[in-house]
């Protein structure tokens, strides 16, 4: 399951969380390496945007709690369909509407 996660860190001075920010990148690297995080980008100012490929909602919950333990943040979460799944859905739904 694909999820786009946008983080907005708690409002603290960036210099006060510099070490935590470095720890965050060390935490996320193994997730990038194993494909759990397909892509990640730092946001201009503060925060990050990550594309998670997760097997269960419980796993997503675990990862977001790990993330928030390092850098307290609020998360905007968007479930996604990959292109192949979206096209398959459109094909199936078009066939269903033609059958009636």
Per-segment meaning from a language model:
Residues 1-100:
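Conserved, structured core segments of small domains
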């Amino acid at each position: 399951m694909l999820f786009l996660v946008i983080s907005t860190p708690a409002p603290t001075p960036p210099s006060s969380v510099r070490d935590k920010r470095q720890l965050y990148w060390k935490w996320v690297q193994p997730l990038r390496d194993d494909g759990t995080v397909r892509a990640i980008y730092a946001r201009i100012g503060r925060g990050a945007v990550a594309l998670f490929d997760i097997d269960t909602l419980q796993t997503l919950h675990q990862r977001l709690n790990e993330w928030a333990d390092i850098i307290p943040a609020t998360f905007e979460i968007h479930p996604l369909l990959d292109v192949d799944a979206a096209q398959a859905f459109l094909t199936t739904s078009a066939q269903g509407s033609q059958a009636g």
